Amino acid sequence: MTGVQTCALPIFAFIVDPIDGTTNFIKDYHVSAISVGLAKDGEKYIGVVYNPYLDEMFTAERGKGAFLNGKPIHVSRNPLSEGIVLFGTAPYYEELSKKSFEMAHAYFKKALDVRRSGSAAIDLCSIAAGRAELYFELRLSPWDFAAGALIVEEAGGVVSTVEGGAVTLGQKCSVLATNGRCGRLE
């Protein structure tokens, strides 16, 4: 047999963050999670985020909805003025800190309040469960957002880059996740 052979099976890849919110975990501040995403042909396919402190398991499979401990969840319908904004400060990128806090302040003026937890996975799941309305961070690695972004989307939310582009699993990028009623700063 000669020539190139190809495999007809889809390509799967796990994208894992064994401790999302590492600094919180080290400091015994109980806001961290285990985040496991499964990509199929480069796209988000399955997402699982487990918060061991609250015994909360968030799950989603593309096209099948999002769940918290087996019960369906959905993003809130609140407008930004009645919403909580969650944000991350991209702590490993000092050059982004000023812009992160400027954005948080701008959202603070328009929203009910703002919060910073230190766990992107938990923040994304908070959007999915309707506990908050918007989350942003100016630079995340795929293992930070792969599982949580799918959970948000399957709960009826919208995930993009802060700039409005598509979030891809192949590189670091900014992330903006919303309930669909809240959006980018103008």
Stretches found by the model and what they are:
Residues 36-124, 172-186:
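Acidic beta-strand-loop-alpha-helix segment within the catalytic core
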Residues 1-9:
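Short, small-residue-biased leader/transition segments that mark boundaries at the very start
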Residues 13-15, 35, 47, 135:
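Short glycine-aspartate micro-motif
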Residues 102-108, 122-186:
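Oxyanion/phosphate-interacting regions
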